[in-house]
Amino acid sequence: HIIVVSALENRYFSGISLGAMQKNRIHLIHSAFDIIYLILGPIFAAVGIALFYTPAKITSGGASGVANILYNLFGFDLGLMTFCVNLPLIAVGVFVFGLKYSIKTFIGSTLLSLWVSFFGKLTGYTGFLDISEPVNILLSAIFGGVLLGTGIGITMKSGCNTGGTDIIAQTIAHYTPIAVGSVSFCFNCLVVGASGYFIGFQPMLFSIIGMFCSSFMGNYVLTGI
C-alpha cells in the first residue's frame, strides 16, 4: 500500500511539475512573439509613413499626422517631431493607465520615431514612386495606409501601441461611455482636416483614402491573423 501511495504521489507531483513547465514554455513563446511583434510593427508603420505618405504629402491621423504637418510647414525632422508629440501623451497615460502601459507605449513610439528617421534619411523622404503622377499619389495612399495599418495592428498584438492620440482616445473612453474607436476616428479626422488647411486640399483627400486603408488593415491584423 505504501508503494502504491508513493507511486501515486510521484505521478501527482510530476504532473504538477510538467504542467508548470508547460505553462512557462507557453509564456516564453508568447513573450518571444510579443518582442517580434514589437520590433516588426514599427518597421512596417515607418515604411508606410516615410516612404509612401510623406513624399506624397499624405497625412496619417494621430501624433504622426501632427508631426507630418510640422515637417511640411517647418522642415523639422519627422521622426523627432513624432517622438516630441508623443511624449506629453505618454505622460497622460502614466496617470491614467499606469507605468507598465506607459513604458510599453514609450518603447513602441520610440521605435516608430527611430525607424521613420532612419528610412527618411536613407531616401531623403523621396520614396519609391514618382509623385508627379497623380496615380502614384493614389498608390502611395493605398500602400502607405496598408503598411501603416499593418504596423499598428502588429504592434498592438504585442500589447503595446505606437502612442499618438489613441492614448487620449483611451483616456476619454476610460471615463466616459464613448467607444475608443469613435474618439480615435474623430481625432484622426481633425488632424487630416488640419492637413487640408496647412498642406493642401488634394493631399487631404488622398489622406482620407489612406486613413480608411490603414484602419481596415489595422482591424484585419488584430482580428484576422
Model feature map: region roles:
Residues 5, 10-225:
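Core subunits and conserved enzymes of cellular information-processing
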